[in-house]
From Swiss-Prot:
<keyword id="KW-0472">Membrane</keyword>
<protein>
    <recommendedName>
        <fullName>Nucleoside-diphosphatase mig-23</fullName>
        <ecNumber>3.6.1.6</ecNumber>
    </recommendedName>
</protein>
<keyword id="KW-1133">Transmembrane helix</keyword>
<feature type="topological domain" description="Lumenal">
    <location>
        <begin position="28"/>
        <end position="489"/>
    </location>
</feature>
<feature type="active site" description="Proton acceptor">
    <location>
        <position position="174"/>
    </location>
</feature>
<keyword id="KW-0334">Gonadal differentiation</keyword>
<dbReference type="GO" id="GO:0046032">
    <property type="term" value="P:ADP catabolic process"/>
</dbReference>
<feature type="topological domain" description="Cytoplasmic">
    <location>
        <begin position="1"/>
        <end position="6"/>
    </location>
</feature>
<dbReference type="GO" id="GO:0004382">
    <property type="term" value="F:GDP phosphatase activity"/>
</dbReference>
<dbReference type="GO" id="GO:0017111">
    <property type="term" value="F:ribonucleoside triphosphate phosphatase activity"/>
</dbReference>
<comment type="similarity">
    <text>Belongs to the GDA1/CD39 NTPase family.</text>
</comment>
<keyword id="KW-0333">Golgi apparatus</keyword>
<dbReference type="GO" id="GO:0005794">
    <property type="term" value="C:Golgi apparatus"/>
</dbReference>
<keyword id="KW-0378">Hydrolase</keyword>
<keyword id="KW-0812">Transmembrane</keyword>
<feature type="glycosylation site" description="N-linked (GlcNAc...) asparagine">
    <location>
        <position position="190"/>
    </location>
</feature>
<dbReference type="GO" id="GO:0005737">
    <property type="term" value="C:cytoplasm"/>
</dbReference>
């Protein structure tokens, strides 16, 4: 009876102790990894570029790993292409019918939701940023459109729509976002390790950033970083921080950034045609010789006031360049720009003393199309070669160019591009050299359409800037995870102590039980060998182990 009682005590103790250990282990094993996995889960963001001719949707995603690094944002990829969709017309056309504005964006919201997990949608921010088109409509129309979007869009989508995320942005911020996107795509925000002295730990240094010029249809934008030592002061200087901590200067940048309204290529053509009309009035005719069109190309022009005249191409591109240059210097300029020592862009906007020729600059939009589509000279800028090829092209008869186009000699250019190439070549080069004072021979300028295989959009820069505080959330969660691990680890010390006590208890019980068994056997037979005794003990232990395993 004594053996049976002790064995029962041992079994009951095991039944109580081992389930407790297993329970704690399971809770620890299933809770902590889940928290860690949550910390690494993917987040999403949606942005709409509401331009003058249409609205484009972009969907981005990221995994935040550290609050000491810049947030890493990438486009969501579907079928090997970034998720993107454009709808027309522009948002500004709803100025007279604002009640339809939110419904107009429904297809974009539905597309975005198809590429975002359902459980993520309530935490996915939606940004609607309107640009030039919305800036031009009356204020009451602007407010009516924005009000409709802010009130009705949350009812259309389950994604996160905040009122402050729906607004009209300044042209300056388009430039800032573009600058961020370009440098991000080039990896210029990645930290590099430098050793100040041999044997010391590496210090983090940041790379030199690049500047950008974006030549659109209505305006041109420029943005580049100023050295910290540059004392230049202007309304066009902006200090931005891309990091999530205000006390960290690693991602703080001082930029010169501004928009030149009226200096896009389409506005340039409009100014040029007004200049031609003023010359024609002096001649009392209806047809004027035009050096900025291919030989014998005719174009009938109707101006805003209803006046008509005909441009007839002569293909003299050198003369064209000289005429275009006159359009860049305004008749009136600020007193600062009239000063001989002052440096100004386009003779009107005060600029830093740092020469743009010394800065690595990237040209987008028309700087790419006008050098690449017809001339095939996109990439590293070569002013002499561009002038030579443009002169050769413009001196051709228009009928010859048409024939060459049919033979696919200009596969990337439509007819409108072929008609306007001469003027656009003159405009973009004149803006670069005469407007921004970039040296024709010694410069670091290049035209691009994509970086690392992706088309660079200011929307990416906007998402990076507005999500910059996101890593702080994960940093706080990491701290909670760390503390949770510390707390759970501290539980194992008493558990180990209890395990030791239990093991001691088992040993004592096992010893007493073995003595009793030996005494009983000795009474029945003193002739049992050691091997037989050992076998009996081994068999009994196996039985006990099997019993205990049923409760493990």
């Amino acid at each position: 009876m004594r053996v049976s009682l002790r064995f029962t005590i041992l079994a009951v103790s095991a039944m109580i102790f081992f389930p407790v250990i297993v329970f704690i282990y399971v809770v620890e094993a299933h809770t902590s990894p889940k928290v860690i996995a949550d910390d690494q889960e993917r987040s999403y963001g949606v942005i709409c570029d509401a331009g003058s001719t249409g609205t484009r949707l972009f969907v981005y995603n990221w995994i935040s790993t550290s609050d000491s690094e810049l947030i890493q944002i990438e486009p969501v990829i579907y079928d090997n292409k970034p998720v993107m969709k454009k709808i027309s017309p522009g948002l500004s056309t709803f100025g007279t019918k604002p009640a339809q504005a939110a419904e107009y964006l429904r297809p974009l919201m539905e597309l975005a939701e198809r590429h975002i997990p359902e459980e993520k949608r309530p935490y996915t921010p939606v940004f609607i940023f309107a640009t030039a088109g919305m800036r031009l409509i009356p204020d009451e129309q602007k407010e009516a459109v924005l009000k409709n979007l802010r009130n009705k869009l949350p009812k259309i989508t389950s994604m996160q729509v905040l009122k402050e995320h729906i607004r009209i942005i300044e042209g300056k911020w388009e430039g800032i976002y573009s600058w961020i996107a370009v440098n991000y795509a080039l990896g210029k925000f990645n930290k590099t390790a430098t050793l100040d002295f041999p044997g010391t730990s590496p210090a983090h240094a940041r790379q030199k950033t690049v500047g950008m010029i974006d030549m659109g249809g209505a305006s041109a934008q420029i943005a580049f970083e100023l050295p910290d030592t540059d004392s230049f002061s202007s309304i066009n200087v902006e200090n931005i921080n891309l990091g999530c901590r205000e006390d960290d200067s690693l991602f703080k940048y001082k930029l010169f950034v501004t928009t030149f309204l009226g200096y896009g290529v389409n506005e340039g053509i409009r100014k040029y045609e007004h200049m031609l009309l003023s010359k024609l009035k002096d001649q009392n005719g209806t047809v004027i010789q035009d050096d900025c069109m291919p030989l014998n190309l005719h174009k009938t022009v109707t101006l805003e006031n209803g006046e008509n005249f005909v441009r007839r191409g002569t293909g003299n591109w050198n003369t064209c360049s000289n005429e275009v240059k006159k359009l860049l210097n305004p008749e009136s300029s600020s007193e600062v720009c009239k000063a001989e020592a002052a440096k100004c862009y386009f003779g009107a906007v005060p600029a830093p003393s740092i020469p743009l020729s010394n800065i690595e600059m990237y040209g987008f939009s028309e700087y790419w199309y006008s050098t690449h589509d017809v001339l095939g000279l996109g990439g590293q800028y070569d002013a002499e070669n561009i002038a030579k090829k443009t002169q050769q092209y413009c001196s051709k008869r228009w009928s010859t160019i048409q024939a060459e186009s049919k033979k696919q000699l200009y596969p990337r250019a439509d007819e409108e591009r072929l008609r306007t190439q001469c003027f656009k070549s003159a405009w973009i080069t004149s803006v670069l050299h005469d407007g921004f004072s970039v040296d024709k021979t010694h410069n670091k300028f290049q035209s691009v359409s994509t970086i690392a295989g992706q088309e660079v959009q200011w929307a990416l820069g906007a998402m990076i800037y507005h999500m910059r505080f996101f890593p702080l959330r994960d940093s706080s969660r990491n701290l909670i995870v760390k503390e949770t691990h510390s707390s759970s680890e501290s539980l194992w010390a008493p558990l180990f102590f209890l395990s030791a006590v239990f093991c001691l208890f088992v040993l004592v019980c096992a010893k007493e039980q073995s003595v009793l068994c030996f005494d009983d056997k000795r009474r029945s037979s003193f002739g049992m060998s050691r091997s037989q005794y050992s076998y009996k003990m081994l068999k009994e232990n196996r039985t006990s182990s099997s019993f205990l395993e049923n409760f493990a």
